[in-house]
Design a protein with these regions (language model features):
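Rossmann-fold NAD(P)H-dependent dehydrogenase/reductase core
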Residues: 1-186
Length: 186
C-alpha cells in the first residue's frame, strides 16, 4: 500500500464532490493537501474543514482551470515551493447543456475535463519525477462509452454540440492520455 503520511498531494476540483471527499480523507491519512480552487471563499471553507480534522497542511492555489494562463500560474506557484509532488489528483470536471468557450477559445468541457489535466500534468512532471514512487490520478468515468472513437475533426464541437458526446470525448481523451503517460513513465 502507498503510505501518504507527509506526502504532498495536489488536487483539482477539491472544493466539492469527489475532490472534496478525497481532500478530507487524504488529510486524515496524513497527507499535505494542496488544491486548486477558482473561488477563494470555497477554498477557505475547505482549509477550515481540513484544519478541524487534521494537523496536515491545507494550501489553496487560486486559479481557473478553464484558462491556460491560470494553469501555468498554478504550476508556477506549486513549482516555486521547491517540494516534491507525490500525487497529482486531476479531478476537476463539468458537463454543459450548451457549448461555451473558454477565454482561450476552446470548448469549455473539453478544456477543463482534459486539456487542463494534460497541461497541468506536463507542467508538474519534474516535481512528480522528484518524488519517489509518485502517482498521477486522472479521474474519468464510463462516459467514454458514449462515443465510438474520437472525432479529431470536431472534438471542439463547433459543428454540432451534443453534451454527452463532448463529455464522452473528454473522458476518452483522459483514458488515452493516462495510458500513454503510463507507457512513457515506465
Amino acid at each position: 500500500m502507498f503510505d501518504i503520511t507527509n506526502k504532498n498531494i495536489l488536487i483539482t476540483g477539491a472544493t466539492s464532490g469527489i475532490g472534496r471527499a478525497a481532500a478530507l480523507k487524504l488529510s486524515l491519512l496524513g497527507a499535505n493537501i494542496f488544491f486548486v480552487a477558482r473561488n477563494e471563499q470555497k477554498a477557505q471553507i475547505l482549509v477550515n474543514e481540513i484544519s478541524e480534522i487534521s494537523d496536515t497542511k491545507a494550501v489553496p492555489i487560486i486559479g481557473d482551470l478553464s484558462s491556460q494562463t491560470d494553469i501555468h500560474s498554478v504550476a508556477k506557484v506549486f513549482n516555486s515551493l521547491n517540494i516534491p509532488l507525490h500525487v497529482l489528483l486531476n479531478n476537476a470536471g463539468l458537463i454543459n447543456k450548451e457549448r461555451k468557450e473558454t477565454v482561450d477559445g476552446l470548448e469549455e468541457v473539453f478544456a477543463i475535463n482534459h486539456i487542463a489535466y494534460f497541461l497541468l500534468t506536463m507542467l508538474l512532471i519534474d516535481r512528480l519525477k522528484e518524488a519517489n514512487n509518485s502517482r498521477i490520478v486522472n479521474v474519468s468515468s464510463g462516459a467514454h462509452a458514449f462515443v465510438k472513437g474520437f472525432n479529431f475533426e470536431d472534438y471542439q464541437a463547433k459543428n454540432a454540440y451534443k453534451p454527452f458526446q463532448v463529455y464522452g470525448y473528454s473522458k476518452l481523451a483522459n483514458i488515452l492520455f493516462t495510458k500513454k503517460l503510463s507507457d512513457i513513465l515506465k
